[in-house]
Amino acid sequence: MTGGVPSLGFACQPDAAEALERWGRWLEHERGASTHTLRSYRADLAGFLAFVAEHRGRPPGLNDLGALDLGAFRAWLAARAADGAGAATRSRGVSGVRSFFRWADRSGLLHNPAIALLTAPKAQRPLPRPLAADDAALLLEEAAAVPEAPWIGLRDRALFTLLYGCGLRISEAIGLNRSDLPAGAASVRVLGKGGKQRDVPVLPAVREAVAAYLAAVPWGGGRAAPLFVGAKGDRLSPDVARRQMRHLRALLGLPDSTTPHALRHSFATHLLGGGADLRAIQDLLGHASLSTTQRYTDVDAEHLLSVYETAHPRARRQGHQTVRSVCDALPPRLRNQESER
């Protein structure tokens, strides 16, 4: 499979291996699947085929896969559960296997009606774990305290301020190029999951943090250059960003749940607590389904009741605009009406 995803060996016959590679290319190029999804699906299919090979006594081909009954699929799930795989992991495995079988059916390679009868385990998704408002503000203020090189500290502050001020995923933030967030820009264009683009308003606090970082970074570059870079000038790795966050939370005594993604959760939770419309938050986060965004309404009331009056902790810092300005920048159809509050 292309796209930088490492190849995994499949315990199967050549015809099935070729089909799996074609399916992987289809996922990547036609469906716009992320590297994480590609890697996970390949691992799930590799485990499934290894299970089938072990229990049939030989690596399966396409004909063997087409002949599997519902009991075989259920036995695989039972084996995964016995190995300690949780409901969420098994549910994702079913999604990956089902995706391959459906693609193979549409491609005329095999037909297996049993896969349509396989139900995925119900995974109880954990509630988002946002930071308290004061902790989020403290983290952004102290974000430059960890690195030895001043420009790296400014980079971390700019990155974490962007995550919190715009609600981006870490992959979206480090995927930005300089042209995506030009100086003084009122919004940033983000390429989200499935290759979907969205425009997110940018607060002055975010613009100021990014400008300070760009003024200090020793690596140049044109509009196509990555916005966030590592110590050698290459595009910043998400693992480096997570490591910097671990160091920072240890320094500040913040809980282990303080991660780059927690800043995205905090963005949504604090906006909701300030009265932002749920559909506006859905658009800002790039959620395909409103039900995903609705999880934030179930977050512990302690988080919502402790939110300040105007919607965002950055509003308490002199010279910084509140996140209500993000809502004001949205189309009228996305804003709460007074009669609805």
Curated annotation (Swiss-Prot):
The yes or no answer to whether the keyword Cytoplasm is present is: yes
Organism of origin is Rhodospirillum centenum (strain ATCC 51521 / SW)
Q: Which family does it belong to?
A: Belongs to the 'phage' integrase family. XerC subfamily.
Q: Which compartments is it annotated to reside in?
A: Cytoplasm
Specify the protein name.
Answer: Tyrosine recombinase XerC
The positions flagged as active site in the entry are: 169, 193, 261, 264, 287, 296 (o-(3'-phospho-dna)-tyrosine intermediate)
> Molecular function (GO) terms listed?
DNA binding; tyrosine-based site-specific recombinase activity
Give the record's keywords alphabetically. Answer: Cell cycle, Cell division, Chromosome partition, Cytoplasm, DNA integration, DNA recombination, DNA-binding
Every copy of the Core-binding (CB) domain together lies at 14-105
Report domain Tyr recombinase positions. Answer: 126-309
